[in-house]
A protein has these predicted regions:
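Lectin-type carbohydrate-recognition ectodomains
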Residues: 2-188
Length: 188
């Protein structure tokens, strides 16, 4: 009789525990015009490339610096395979390879609601960052809703010039031996 009570209490406590969603989404920011994109791939994100374009304008009677910078394109690497380039490969390229057990846990930056994503910062769980563009206009900050999640994919829109909107999708990666190791291991 006592064991029936213990089992019943155990099952009731299991049902009372909140079930944590393994995925979350940070809503897209930006103008949102152009061709939609969704990055995807097998395994963890192991590398990132971001292209930024900086425009400086000169006027007739005086020098005027316009800090009109924007993200022209980006690319994610899943395992050893690079995704297509979303946007275009124009301007200056910034690149970051992730270490083993390193993951992107925050996406932040600035956007101009009239045109492009102007600044993009990707931060890892090791505290490393990749920063592209110039910080001006409206801020955004994306991070996972659940502990232990990491960036799984980016979505949004781009046109022939740059990225017009961006959103982040977070989740768990269930893989044995996931990482960015290129070394060969031998067993004895």
């Amino acid at each position: 009789m006592f064991s029936i009570v213990v089992v019943t209490v155990f099952l009731a406590s299991c049902l009372a525990m909140p079930i944590q969603e393994p995925y979350s989404y940070s809503s897209a920011v930006g103008q949102g015009l152009g061709t939609p994109f969704v990055s995807s791939g097998e395994g963890r994100i192991t590398g990132v490339r971001v292209w930024e374009t900086n425009n400086n304008y000169y006027y007739y009677y005086y020098y005027y610096y316009n800090s009109n910078a924007y993200i022209s394109g980006f690319q994610l690497r899943y395992g050893y395979t690079w995704s297509p380039v979303f946007g275009r490969e124009g301007g200056v390229k910034q690149e970051m390879e992730l270490f083993n057990d390193e993951a992107i846990v925050e996406v932040s930056g600035k956007y101009n609601p009239a045109d492009y994503i102007g600044h993009l910062v990707l931060t890892t769980n090791n505290g490393r960052t990749l920063s592209a563009g110039l910080p001006s206009q409206i801020s955004f900050n994306f991070y996972p809703a659940n502990m232990g999640n990491e960036l799984r994919l980016l979505s949004g829109r781009f046109n022939g010039v740059g990225i017009t909107s961006i959103g982040a999708h977070w989740g768990l990666v269930y893989m044995e031996g996931a990482g960015n190791s290129t070394g060969n291991s031998t067993s004895s």
